C-alpha cells in the first residue's frame, strides 16, 4: 500500500477524494462560507476549540470530536475559540460529482 505524504492533497482518481490539515489561531470568525459538497466530509479535531454550524445546528468541537457532514449538508466554520488544528477528509464524489465548496443559490443542488 502506498504512503501518501503532505498535509493537503487530492487524489487524482476517478472517485476523487481530498483531505487536509487545517490550523487556525484563536479569534477567527466566519472562517469558511456556508457551503456543501457532492460528497461526505469528516472533520477530526486534534487540538483547540472551535465552533461549526451544520444544517443550522451549532456545534462546539474539542479534541477527539468528529463532525460528519453528509453530501448536500450546508456547513461552515463559524469561530475559532482556541488555537485549533483539525484534519478533514472528503469521501468519493457522488451526485453531480462537483469538487470544492459549493454555494446554495449559486451552485444548484
What are these regions (language model features)?
Residues 42, 49, 58, 74, ...:
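Structural motif
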Residues 96-109:
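Acidic/histidine-enriched, glycine/proline-rich intrinsically disordered or flexible terminal extensions
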Residues 1-34, 39-40, 89-91:
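A short glycine-rich, His/Asp/Glu-containing loop-to-beta-strand
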Residues 36-52:
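Short, conserved beta-strand element in jelly-roll/cupin
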Residues 56-72:
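Short acidic-glycine-tyrosine-enriched beta hairpin
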Residues 71-97:
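Ligand-binding loop in jelly-roll beta-barrel domains
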Amino acid at each position: 500500500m502506498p504512503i501518501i505524504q503532505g498535509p493537503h492533497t487530492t487524489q487524482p482518481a476517478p472517485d476523487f477524494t481530498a483531505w487536509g490539515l487545517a490550523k487556525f489561531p484563536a479569534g477567527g470568525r466566519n472562517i469558511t462560507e456556508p457551503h456543501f459538497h457532492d460528497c461526505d466530509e469528516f472533520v477530526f479535531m486534534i487540538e483547540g476549540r472551535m465552533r461549526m454550524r451544520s444544517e443550522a445546528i451549532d456545534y462546539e468541537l474539542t479534541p477527539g470530536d468528529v463532525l460528519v457532514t453528509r453530501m448536500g449538508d450546508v456547513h461552515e466554520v463559524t469561530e475559532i475559540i482556541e488555537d485549533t488544528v483539525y484534519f478533514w477528509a472528503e469521501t468519493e464524489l457522488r451526485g453531480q460529482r462537483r469538487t470544492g465548496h459549493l454555494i446554495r443559490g449559486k451552485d444548484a443542488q
